[in-house]
Amino acid sequence: MFKAVNPRQNFPQMEEEILKIWQDKGIFKKSIENRRDGKRFTLYEGPPTANGRPGIHHVLSRVFKDVIPRYKVMKGYYAPRIGGWDTHGLPVELEVEKELGFTSKNDIEKYGIAEFNTRCRSSVFKYVSEWNKLTERIAYWVDLDNAYITMDNKYIESGWWALKQMWDKGLVYQGHRVTPHCPRCGTSLSSHEVAQGYKDNTEDPSVFVKFEINHESLAQTGLGQKWVNPSDKPLYLLAWTTTPWTLPANTALAVSATDEYAILDMADYYMVLAKPRLSSLKLTENPIVGECLGSDLKGLTYKPLFDPREFGISVKNMQDNSEIDALEPLSYPVITTSYVSMDDGTGIVHTAPAYGELDYESGVKYGLKFVHHVDLQGRITGNYPFAGKFVKEADKDISRNLKERGLMFRNERMHHTYPFCWRCDSPLIYYAKQSWYIRTTAVRDELIKGNQQINWYPEHIKDGRFGDWLENNIDWAFSRERYWGTPVPIWRCEKCGQTECVGGIDELKAKPNFKGMQEKLDIHRPYADEWTYDCAKCGGNMKRVTEVMDCWYDSGAMPVAQYHYPFEPESRTIASDGRFPADYICEAVDQTRGWFYSLHAISTLIFGRPCYQNVICLGHILDERGEKMSKSKNNVIQPAAVLDKYGADAVRWYFYTAAPPGNARRFSEKLVGEVTRQFLLMLWNIYSFFVTYANIDNFTPSEKYLAGEVPELDRWILSELNQLVLDVDKGLDNYDPTQAGRRIEDFVGYLSNWYVRRSRRRFWKSENDADKLSAYQALYTCLVTLSKLLAPFTPFVAEELYQNLVLLVDQSALESVHLTDFPVADKALIDEQLDNEIRLVMKVSSMGRSARSKAALKVRQPLAEVRVVLSSPAERTGLMRLAEQVLEELNVKALVAEEPGTAIPQENYVASTEGAYTVAVYTGLSPELLAEGSAREIVHRLQTMRKSAEFEIADYINTHYQADEYLESVIRTHAEYIKKETLSNQIVNGNAPEGAYTESLDIDGHPLSLWVVR
């Protein structure tokens, strides 16, 4: 006997019970240890930060990380999965700053770095219990007891070792360059961090500013040879910018050497801009008084909008960093560059070397002047009228100043894409300063080549989003002017400037006259700031630089750092024992510019090869309407709410099957509820049906029931089952859970809507003959195989099926479905011809039901005929061989198979068409057909009454009735049919005994009273 199955199963409650079974029996640990002799399969876990609560997007990534290793374990692989925690960086610091009410780095300095970092350390696991609970609840099997933690000393030391390898190859340098800078956080950001913070539709100023040309410079240029100022009117160059705050630092104007420029007569002055831009700027009505190429403008000089020296700001030469004397006249040049565009602006580019990457490069190339009037907090410095204001606030003041001086040509607003800090949401500024860089551009070709060795799912990511990122790779600005992070392991001599990179603690301790290390090692600021030693070159004091590492460097170093490579002896075999490279990683698509990149870059820089082989790249989660989830829209769904209502299996199944992994997917409680109804409940109803009838008949599973001559319906479902095993195996082996899951959905649909429905009478009949036992065994085989196929996807319901159907009847069976092997298809049982024939029958039946629906003819009403137009003559044989099934499904008396292209008569036929197929039902009804339809309706009503009266499925009953003349005739004529279908011993005309269940009904417009009694 099987355990009785509740048809109204509470899935969340069932899952909690199964979690206890797994925990009590240590099933996760056993699933790994039992496969220790198998080939290793390695998952790298992208480390989350536990100082924030897990969201539904974390559920998405975790269930996709889970499905493949579960499958691999069932295929015999040894697959220990180590968790990880990302514990450093701005995400952590900002949360602590909020708790302390801090608004700047100065607040941290006053509070004390040691105390601040202590708060950071204690905050990183603030919500770890919620993470652990969610991880267990969704059945993501990962070892969190031995998880790697990026703030651990051993992890940090491996990160130091990795940087030392790059240093020794000449790939680490300090440079004065323009980098993206967060004024709120007071630190540079890497290009992959910047890529995660862009916001579309950001409103900014759009100002067109006039720069007055020095008249005396005109004669020395090509323009002076082509055009002579016919009056005393001043000549201006018109430039455009969206960052007015950078204008006080302007030291050049850039033009395109090969494009045409026009001189316009603006009545009171002349103005130069690119000729292709006249139309867009609506300046075609102004007279053109001169034309030239951009190269003719080179050599012109113009008057500064502001003389910084008047406001207490120095002006320096970029060639030698010398300061310009306060009395020296100041003028700036027109230069030619390749980056001037004719798609926007004026064709004349405002150039401020301190605040633009290309501007800085031009400054170095042409030896421009250099002006820095903004501090690291993004505030205007000096004695400007707008000093002390944040740059974005100063935009209006600067624009107003220029307008008052007659230098503002237009002042508008525009919407464009602008970078914001990926963590604190402050607008970034581009800022020239010293930073430490990893020369990733030196290995660009190796990065691109290595990417070709990685299997990406979806495939277009390889040469698309990720490939493009690698093609346009720039050097990695990895240092951060912050506090809580891996200290940059570079020491500099305070006397001679000698710099050294240290690759480990023992190496550091071996330095001459090393001192400052505390008894309890903590490789963090401020302690690491105190570690000094003597310079080998001059004997001076070697002191560590103050920066910490980009937290993306931490997570990107995990392939080595999680094992404390190369310091632990057992870590040195990672390349030979299957721990490196990873077989599989999985995260959201934005990690192409985050963790996926940092992993790939560090591995390539150190080892010259990729560190992962297969990637599932997940699309984003949207709300029910397809909009991005955000707190401001109040459309964020908390995982607990959905898990408590529908269970983890429903959420998992929805994520696997709703859309291919790389696609964005909508998510809501309603959508998960639909999956529950359409798949899980369908499967559960099959399971419940089987157990109910198997228990009635005391069925004991045995393969002998499928030996010898097997009924065609059973042969078909077993053929479909074995084809399903092949397809699911192939899908998961190809890292495509969606394709595999959808095939399971199709099969469960076949099983429920065709096999079980068409086999019901086989289960209902009283005798346990070979046909009935074959049906039981076939359905049992399907359910047990499904439990194993579903184990990687829906581990709870798979376990429930296995515990009841297998373990309860076979005490020698393995104690969990998750310890069993993945099913292996018996190809000898696959009959493609039979599969195709029955699928054709199902298609014809479905189209026939559609035609009946169009004709408003309920299925219980028998019809005289159905005509089927096929797509090829070859299909006729199979259809006619299985014609009886079509007749039963559509409740018709005759089937006519027409040749392809045959026209169906219009009169008395209603048709449904799909491609080359047409199925048409004859709508004419004879008295005999009407009577039979009424009899079927009576059967339907009696079956409903049995349920309402709470009779058992196997209970026999007596039926009593009172009817008019028409229904009296129907019941007499079809009495045997009615008795058989409703398990009625007799049908009696007249009132039933007292206590009978009764209903008064209307059958096709005729009154009928029915009584049923056991």
Swiss-Prot record:
Record-listed ATP binding positions: 631
Main localization (coarse): cytoplasm
Keyword presence, Acyltransferase: no
Enzyme Commission number(s) from the entry: 6.1.1.5
SUPFAM superfamilies in UniProt: Anticodon-binding domain of a subclass of class I aminoacyl-tRNA synthetases, Nucleotidylyl transferase, ValRS/IleRS/LeuRS editing domain
Gene Ontology biological process terms from the UniProt entry: isoleucyl-tRNA aminoacylation
Function: Catalyzes the attachment of isoleucine to tRNA(Ile). As IleRS can inadvertently accommodate and process structurally similar amino acids such as valine, to avoid such errors it has two additional distinct tRNA(Ile)-dependent editing activities. One activity is designated as 'pretransfer' editing and involves the hydrolysis of activated Val-AMP. The other activity is designated 'posttransfer' editing and involves deacylation of mischarged Val-tRNA(Ile).
UniProt remark on domains: IleRS has two distinct active sites: one for aminoacylation and one for editing. The misactivated valine is translocated from the active site to the editing site, which sterically excludes the correctly activated isoleucine. The single editing site contains two valyl binding pockets, one specific for each substrate (Val-AMP or Val-tRNA(Ile)).
Assembly behavior: Monomer.
Family: Belongs to the class-I aminoacyl-tRNA synthetase family. IleS type 2 subfamily.
Protein's recorded name: Isoleucine--tRNA ligase
Lineage: Bacteria, Bacillati, Chloroflexota, Dehalococcoidia, Dehalococcoidales
Chain's gene name: ileS
